[in-house]
Amino acid sequence: MSSNKINKKSIARIAAVQAIYQNILQNNDDMDDIMQNVLSFYQNNNAITDLPENLKISLSISHFKMLVKSVFENIHKLDEIIDNHLTNDKDPAHMPILLRALLRVSICELLFCPTTPAKVVINEYTDIANDMLNEHEIGFVNSVLDKIAKEHTRLI
């Protein structure tokens, strides 16, 4: 039986969203503690019980750590960017936590990881959003990332 693998960077992106979600939910600013909790979960293959037997999950630890550290270092700038993309009738304080976590990580990778093409970042996080968010939020993620990618390329 052949074993299937999911891209290690894709798993790192999901794990980074989980770490930032944990940061927001628990109001925990101990980045090392958060990263260790998430890494422990992924390193314990028995913790993920609803996967097919032949599916192997492992993440790029370096990409995960880079994403989480970059979000922590740029959190205020990221939140400002997110809030600037909200329509006037939306209150930033009422944004769902998971949506904010996903946007923080995705915008961070889009702006601060120039080695990853914008199209890849947009596709990856739209796929992640498809598994985690409702239809309206998925469209919002795609729209915001697309706008930021276009704005960013004009600045280069």
Swiss-Prot record:
Keywords: RNA-binding, Transcription, Transcription antitermination, Transcription regulation. GO terms for cellular component: cytosol. The keyword RNA-binding applies. One of its GO terms (biological process) is transcription antitermination. One of its GO terms (molecular function) is RNA binding. The keyword Transcription regulation applies. SUPFAM superfamilies: NusB-like. InterPro entries: NusB-like_sf, NusB_fam, NusB_RsmB_TIM44. Pfam families: NusB (PF01029). Involved in transcription antitermination. Required for transcription of ribosomal RNA (rRNA) genes. Binds specifically to the boxA antiterminator sequence of the ribosomal RNA (rrn) operons. Belongs to the NusB family. This is Transcription antitermination protein NusB.
